[in-house]
UniProtKB/Swiss-Prot annotation:
Cofactor(s) this protein cannot do without: [2Fe-2S] cluster; Mg(2+)
Catalytic activity: (2R)-2,3-dihydroxy-3-methylbutanoate = 3-methyl-2-oxobutanoate + H2O; (2R,3R)-2,3-dihydroxy-3-methylpentanoate = (S)-3-methyl-2-oxopentanoate + H2O
GO biological process, one term: isoleucine biosynthetic process
Protein's UniProt keywords contain Lyase: yes
Protein name, as recorded: Dihydroxy-acid dehydratase 1
Statement: the UniProt record of this protein carries the keyword Iron: yes
Cofactor note: Binds 1 [2Fe-2S] cluster per subunit. This cluster acts as a Lewis acid cofactor.
GO molecular function, one term: dihydroxy-acid dehydratase activity
Gene encoding the protein: ilvD1
Enzyme Commission numbers on file: 4.2.1.9
Annotated organism of origin: Aromatoleum aromaticum (strain DSM 19018 / LMG 30748 / EbN1) (Azoarcus sp. (strain EbN1))
Length: 567
């Protein structure tokens, strides 16, 4: 990078708390932790670890944090470990606890920013696993703009039962099968026990793996690191190398906002489209771009979708898991295909100091013939990307649908209206939803939920009952990366602020049309105007605590559901 970005000293920030007579009390605190006088002048590097025994996604992070700390020390830096929280989507799913998931994204970003800036750290390594660790950590990196790198905790390996690979979504779908009488109780219990065999994040191209792949494409994580399994030795080696790379970035003055540019975000979103990634990536990259002060809208996703095909056959709508993608060449192989087709910006710089083109220089031009995970651009799974932005009188600000793999790209049917996920789930489990229905779940948006719960439980139950292709679902909430089917989320404006989804009545005709990118309430304008005049805003569900704060400050989902948009 250019000289103006290079710090005069590698401890340019931390010297504020280590240098001079007035900082003797500060140094005394460091001596208490084993620092020596020769350590002052070395960069202080935060290691923000989301390790916990809350979830398998994060239960294997401590060895990575220890490895990073040791490698930082060897590279001449002072590691400073601190924790950041996590909320398990898989455990909170379908309960009140899920309301805290998206909230935790903001808490994670705020907590890392607080420690990095409060302690004048010269750099930071963020180590995360579960879904919201990913955007929360990246938002903190670009907010603070101190040299930083993201170390993904790694994917879980698949479970196995009766010759079938399993993952966490297998269990959610098994619930629907069991309720429908299509699954033996013994098999149901064995799937439950075997689906998650150890530590690591959920194994398909679900939200955590989507974001890790995107961070690699963004240039903020090392090549190949996003598809490694948590329990494999190469993940520890990659973590150590990440620490060494960060120390070099500190010396060069290479900062996150030098890397996370508009072009780099285009690269990341292109990889999300090519790999069939999660709808949550739309919400999270709106938030990351906002934190980085990069102009970015939901229409940018649609622009990229139209030119980037889906070339990776990944679950939930495909066949393979992240461990399979890793063996097939990982994200660098996918990026090489996109770069050679002119679909990536090769000049974007990465945390290594190399450009994207330089990083990919020695990657094979074509994927291996003996694998089926990565296709070529001449033989894609789908000619266009899968995350479509839909609009219509139900969602004038836009909403998100995952349209790949649908046998029936359109549905018009009677609305089955529910004012919470819980009410909808009760109806689904009671078998009151039938083929041709369009389920509307509202008051689950950023403000109304609050927290935009993910609707994996309802969608998986529908799939398990054999209704995944014949029932539509529309919500102002979100979907898990494991969701597939005729589903539309992030409907904006949300019901809580009087968005049109609040005006839908039981039995109204509703259309979802993926090809026309339309989500429409088939009711006349005059009738909708009458309903709008009669609508009254509901009382907040929470008046104290973190959920109340999030509800007060959260923006529309079309703006990323961020909490600092209009401060």
């Amino acid at each position: 990078m250019s000289d103006p970005t290079r710090p005069a000293r590698i401890d340019e920030r931390s010297r504020n708390v280590t240098e001079g007579v007035m900082r003797a009390p500060n140094r005394s605190m460091y001596y208490a932790m084993g620092y020596r006088e020769t350590d002052f002048g070395k960069p202080m590097v935060g290691v923000a670890s989301a390790h916990s025994t809350i979830t398998p996604c994060n239960s294997g992070l401590q060895p990575l944090a220890d490895t990073v700390a040791a490698a930082l020390k060897e590279a001449g830096a002072n590691p400073q470990l601190f924790g950041t929280p996590t909320v398990s989507d898989g455990i909170g799913m379908g309960t009140e606890g899920m309301k805290y998931s998206l909230v935790s994204r903001e808490v994670i970003a705020d907590s890392i920013e607080t420690c990095v800036n409060g302690l004048w750290q010269d750099g930071v390594v963020v180590i995360g696993g579960c879904d919201k660790n990913m955007p929360g950590g990246m938002m903190a990196l670009v907010r603070t703009n101190v040299p930083g790198i993201y170390v993904y905790g790694g994917t879980i390996k698949p479970g196995h039962y009766k010759g079938r690979d399993l993952n966490i979504v297998s269990v959610f779908e098994a619930v629907g099968e069991f309720i429908a009488g299509q699954l033996d109780p013994v098999d149901f219990k064995e799937i439950e026990k075997r689906a998650c065999p150890g530590s690591g994040s959920c194994g398909g191209m679900y939200t955590a793996n989507t974001m890790s792949a995107a961070f690699e494409a963004l240039g903020m994580s090392l090549p190949y690191s996003s598809t490694m399994a948590n329990e494999d030795a190469e993940k520890l080696a990659s973590a150590a190398e990440s620490a060494r790379v960060l120390v070099e970035a500190i010396k060069r003055g290479l900062r996150p906002r030098d890397i996370v540019t508009r072009e780099a975000i285009e690269n990341a979103v292109s990889v999300i489209m090519a790999t069939g990634g999660s709808t949550n990536a739309v919400l999270h990259f709106l938030a990351i771009a906002h934190a980085a002060e990069v102009p970015w809208t939901i229409d940018d996703f649609e622009r990229i979708r139209r030119r980037v095909p889906v070339i990776v056959d990944m679950k939930p709508s495909g066949r393979y898991l992240a461990t399979d993608l890793h063996q097939a060449g990982g994200i660098p192989q996918v990026m090489k295909l996109l770069l050679d087709a002119g679909l990536l910006h090769g000049a974007c710089v990465t945390i290594t100091g190399q450009t994207i083109a330089e990083v990919l220089e020695n990657v094979p031009a074509a994927p291996r013939a003996d694998q089926g995970v990565i296709r070529t651009l001449s033989d894609p799974l789908y000619a266009e990307g899968h995350l479509a932005i839909l609009r219509g009188n139900l969602s004038p600000e836009g909403c998100v649908a995952k349209i790949s793999g649908l046998k029936n790209p359109a549905i018009t049917g009677p609305a089955r209206v529910f004012d919470s996920e819980d009410d909808a789930m009760a109806a689904i489990m009671a078998r009151r939803i039938v083929e041709g229905d369009v389920v509307v779940i509202r008051y689950e948006g950023p403000k109304g939920g609050p927290g935009m719960r993910e609707m994996l439980a309802p969608t998986s139950a529908l799939v398990g009952q054999g209704l995944g292709e014949s029932v539509g679902l529309i919500t102002d909430g979100r979907f898990s990366g494991g969701t597939w089917g005729m589903v539309v989320g992030h409907v904006s404006p949300e019901a809580f602020v009087g968005g049109p989804i609040a005006l839908v009545r039981e039995g109204d005709s509703v259309t979802i049309d993926a090809h026309r990118q339309l989500v429409q309430l088939n009711v006349g304008d005059e009738e909708l105007a009458r309903r709008a005049a009669d609508w009254t805003p509901p009382s907040p569900r929470y008046t104290r605590g973190v959920l109340a704060k999030f509800a007060k400050f959260a923006s529309s989902a079309s703006k990323g559901a961020v909490t600092d948009l209009d401060l």
